[in-house]
Amino acid sequence: TPKEAQALADKARRLGMRLLGPGSLGLVHTHPGVRLAAGLAPLPKEGVLAISSQSGTLGRAVLAFAEEMGLGVASFVSLGAKADISSNDLLQFWEEDERTRVILLYLEHFGNPRRFSRLARRIGKKKPILAVHPSRDPLVRALFAQAGVVRANSLEEAFDVALLLAQG
């Protein structure tokens, strides 16, 4: 339940840890010194694309699609229900990650839209941010436009753009 997830996140914080999930597929990091596949996701080839998905099921498909297109992945994080770690936390990590050159987000909802907008505006000046959001809500469209996020209408479209940006 959400209440139990929050209690777990609170306990993790008290112990000095962060919590991914619940409902997360896990995370992948392909840096040669760290190569990590924590969860059920296979380890993709190393690359410059950072990917986040809230959906674990979709996450597996996203990694398979990246492999099919020949796109290497710097890191992949399946956020799950986001009791603690959010897309905003990932954006801050990827901003500092020298290997990440392109960021792709599959967002189902925003925890803190203002913070997202502020971070995306800053980070997007250095690294392009692509996003897929299942809603056709004009407010989401406006948020992405204001933040400088490139909105894709589908994962296929997002990966086509990511492929071009990763090569450039």
Locate the predicted segments by residue:
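Catalytic-core regions of core metabolic enzymes
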Residues: 1-168
